[in-house]
Amino acid sequence: MKKVYSFLLYILGLTTFAQNSNNEQFPLFHDCEGLVGKQQESCFYNTIQNYFYTNYKIPQELQNQQYKGTVIVLFEVDTVGNFKVLYADAAHELLKKEAIRVFESLPKVAPATYSGKATYSKFTIKINIPLVAPNSIDGNESTKYAKTNTLLIDNKKELSEYDNIQYKPFENPQFKSTGIVQFSHQNYGVFDALLNQVGSNNHTASKPYSYDEVAKYYDLETANQSFLKKKDSWWGRKLWNENVVAIQGEEYWFTLNPILDFRVGKDTESQASNTFVNTRGIIVNGGLGKQLTFTTSIYESQGRFADYYNAYAESIRPSGGNPAIIPGIGIAKRFKEDAYDFPLAEANIKYQPNKFINLQLGYGRNFLGDGYRSLLQSDAASPYPYFKINTTFWKIKYTNTYMWLKDVRDAVTIDGTYTTKYMASHYLSMNVTKRWNLGFFENVVWTNTNERGFDFNFVNPLIFYRTVEFGSSSKTGNALLGLTSKYKWNNQINFYGQFLIDEFAISDVKESNQSWRNKFAYQIGAKYYDAFKVKNLLLQVEYNQVRPYVYSHSNPITNYGHNNQSMGHLWGANFREFVAIARYYRGRYFADAKLIYGQRGFDFNDGTNNFNYGGNIYLDYDENRPYDNG
């Protein structure tokens, strides 16, 4: 792991740069001319404080009450040097009006400049009531203490740094940031049509998207404004319109919101009274400058599902005694007698040094494809740690993802510790024409055989993984190749598909004997936006077929899985599936309808028929295989 950290630091080091603050200048009053740097800043604030002390008139009725308090004013200096109050806050309206009057009477100044050009500048000032005469401090306090150790700390003195922190009105900066838009098919369906217009030069297969990618085609901020309700109370505004906590300052912002979700249902074939999911959580989003964004969310849930779902969750339970793994979430503990307690955490830190490259360090899931399912890399498994590099230029987007996965079976658990395995993939997406997109996918899974660890042979994003795999021993790695394609018939209809090769033997293809060694999968689908001229109605059909033994390996630990779940299609292998979906939304309301029909090949495991028919990706495909052909 030390090598991994060194590599990440090296990548980040390549993108750092220094900024020169000497090209910035504060607004200048006439008396401040000739000063430079911090002297300009001090003179600017001192002049305003002096002006307020001289000209601010406290209303007589407040003087009679011996009122004590503060007035906070957010103001700007425009490009010609005029002062303008943006926001004033005080306990009494008279105090705010007087502050605005004083600002309007301030003399015109030389505007702030950046790189020699006049620019707008914003400031915040705090005025104490009653007024206090500005004190001029001779010399720098820190210099005094540095020169001698005979000065005692003044317990009555307070620094003003905390009080001088400047805040701005929250302007929803996340909608224009490089932050991640949380992925779900329902959420992305709102703007999917606009991203898939003929002639667009984007890449929709690699998900999740960032806000700035979506904002080119869909105005997220305007859409958010259209959802707002007329609410005046604090509770009403926070419930319907605003973030519970939202802070924006100079070059930074962050939000914090609680998550509450309660669902109840009924399984008619179950003896349980009902099904339910009760979720509480918190989500934090933020940005530091324009290049660094972050998001993290923590969920705590209890739930009881339909009997068939409970049975599946328990069938993939981990080593160690926990009763189940909730698909797409993680390991669950027992809750009461027939329910589960399952936490979930996801996080992403994204650094974008320029418009071509972004680096992401996260704990979550990724998705490759334009369909409802993905055969290459889906979001069906539990979250995992990953490092991702996106490179976008010309007509190309190149995505490299390095993942740390877990095998939680009894057979590979040592001293209560689950086995770690590694996965590296790269996906090259190219817009061949204004209608046709073509993508190439390579992936390899390997383990810590012979203390191999994270093999840096796979870090090079341009290398052909299959060649490296055999150079490192084909028995300790598992490689897959894939192809994706999308064709935009017009702005309403597009067709998409995927083809995955796990293993392929040309000799068996020529014999047409349906050899088990020809392990491949494919997907075809179509989307119809604003179907039948109904605004915001999306219709989608999709067919998926995965042959037996796809995603599996002779050494099960190097299969295409994580936490006893498939990293590809969630059904694993040996199946056919047809999906039909209708989605409709209007304002805050949405409706989804899905029809899923499938045929799957299962193992019997009844003591007599214990063959491996190729559906369970956690079985060795060289053992108990009933047929080689057919």
Task: Please report, for each region that a protein language model flagged, where it lies by residue.
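Buried hydrophobic packing residues in well-ordered domains
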Residues: 78-81, 361, 428, 497, ...
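Charge-biased low-complexity segments
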Residues: 5-6, 18-150
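A mature extracytoplasmic/lumenal domain signature
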Residues: 75, 87-90, 125, 131, ...
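Outer-membrane beta-barrel channel domains
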Residues: 156-437, 443-448, 511-520, 527, ...
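Exposed, low-structure sequence patches enriched in small/polar residues
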Residues: 249, 342, 434-630
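Residue-level recognition of well-ordered beta-strand positions that form the cores
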Residues: 74-76, 128, 285, 498, ...
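Surface-exposed coil/turn segments at beta-strand junctions on protein surfaces, enriched
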Residues: 66, 114, 118, 287, ...
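Sec-dependent N-terminal signal peptides
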Residues: 4-14
